[in-house]
Regions:
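A conserved regulatory-domain signal marking ACT and ACT-like small-molecule sensing domains
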Residues: 1-168
């Protein structure tokens, strides 16, 4: 088993941040394994999985010296994948925006023991009405025995106009 450092990063966006992170990790013999980054409201945020030697303190301390970024890390042990006990499903939602819609979706998914592995949300202006439309793309991990039709019906009950689609 290998030690992995899970690093979260947030700070004002600027050119060259990913290069700076990658160079710092490589300089301390860390191996960049996986990552996900995004720019929201002028802020750069993301998470990186780094294979490290030992406890990874050198890598984390070096990263924390990068000016203007709030960097935190958690050390873990990379485990081999266990037998499949869940199914991966993609979900797409579109409906009129309103306060609490993400909470309502998350509550229903938790009720069925469905884990949100990835969530992307955004707003757009409705083509006909000009009203704000809520969009969500989710990657979920659901128990093999969960009734996805029942989950679908419960999600549709959130609002009359909410379109719910399982994606391929």
């Amino acid at each position: 088993m290998n030690n992995v450092l899970i690093v979260s990063v947030i700070g004002p966006d600027r050119s060259g941040l990913v290069e700076q992170l990658a160079a710092t990790i490589a300089a301390k013999n860390g191996n960049w394994l996986e990552s996900s980054f995004s720019r929201l409201a002028g802020q750069f945020s993301g998470i990186v999985k780094v294979a490290v030697i030992g406890a990874g303190e050198e890598v984390l301390l070096a990263l924390q010296q990068i000016a203007g970024l709030d960097i935190r890390g958690v050390l873990d042990v990379e485990r081999e994948e266990t037998a499949l006990v869940s199914q991966s499903v993609a979900l797409s939602l579109i409906g009129h925006d309103r306060v609490g819609i993400v909470k309502d979706v998350a509550t229903i998914l938790a009720r069925f023991a469905v884990n949100i592995e990835k969530l992307e949300t955004w707003l757009s202006s409705g083509a006909m009405s000009g009203e704000m439309m809520f969009h969500a793309q989710l990657i979920l991990s659901a128990p093999l025995d969960v009734d996805l039709d029942q989950v679908h019906r419960q999600l549709e009950c959130i609002a009359d106009d909410l379109m719910v689609e399982w994606a391929d």
